[in-house]
């Protein structure tokens, strides 16, 4: 298997993301590449980030509900990119809008 993150199979390598409270989310590395920040951290052979070697990233400033919504967006984006079907609305709880915007900016999503 190639060490290039762009060639990983969607279901091969898993990544663990942790919220500020330590809640663990497990997803495929490929799904997380919607985030430019995460993709850079996991950039393969030349990556010096500990996150790439441990397959886990801890977000001290992102709450569990916000990180959960971010991950839902990763799956939404992967499903509907290049889709010919109508794009459904992506629901967002008003209580997390500002925090979600900040997280999206940080994650380059």
From Swiss-Prot:
Q: Write out the entry's keywords from A to Z.
A: Nucleus, Transcription, Transcription regulation, Ubl conjugation pathway
Coiled-coil-forming residues are: none
Does this UniProt record's set of keywords contain Nucleus? yes
Quote the SMART domains the UniProt record gives.
Skp1 (SM00512)
Tell me any Pfam family this protein matches. Skp1_POZ
State the compartments where it is located: Nucleus
Q: Name one GO molecular function term.
A: protein-macromolecule adaptor activity
Q: What is its main location?
A: nucleus
What Gene Ontology terms for biological process does this UniProt record contain? ubiquitin-dependent protein catabolic process
Annotated Gene Ontology cellular components are: elongin complex
Task: Give the protein family.
Answer: Belongs to the SKP1 family.
* Function comment: SIII, also known as elongin, is a general transcription elongation factor that increases the RNA polymerase II transcription elongation past template-encoded arresting sites. Subunit A is transcriptionally active and its transcription activity is strongly enhanced by binding to the dimeric complex of the SIII regulatory subunits B and C (elongin BC complex). The elongin BC complex seems to be involved as an adapter protein in the proteasomal degradation of target proteins via different E3 ubiquitin ligase complexes.
| Protein name according to UniProt | Elongin-C
């Amino acid at each position: 298997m190639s060490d290039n993150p762009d060639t990983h199979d969607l279901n091969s390598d898993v990544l663990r993301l942790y919220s500020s409270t330590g809640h663990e989310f497990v997803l495929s590395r490929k799904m997380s590449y919607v985030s430019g920040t995460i993709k850079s951290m996991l950039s393969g052979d030349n990556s010096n980030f500990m996150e790439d070697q441990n397959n886990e990233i801890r977000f001290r400033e992102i709450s569990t509900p916000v990180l959960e919504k971010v991950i839902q967006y990763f799956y939404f984006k992967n499903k509907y990119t290049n889709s010919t079907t109508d794009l459904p609305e992506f629901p967002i709880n008003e209580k997390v809008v500002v925090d979600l915007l900040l997280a999206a900016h940080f994650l380059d999503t």
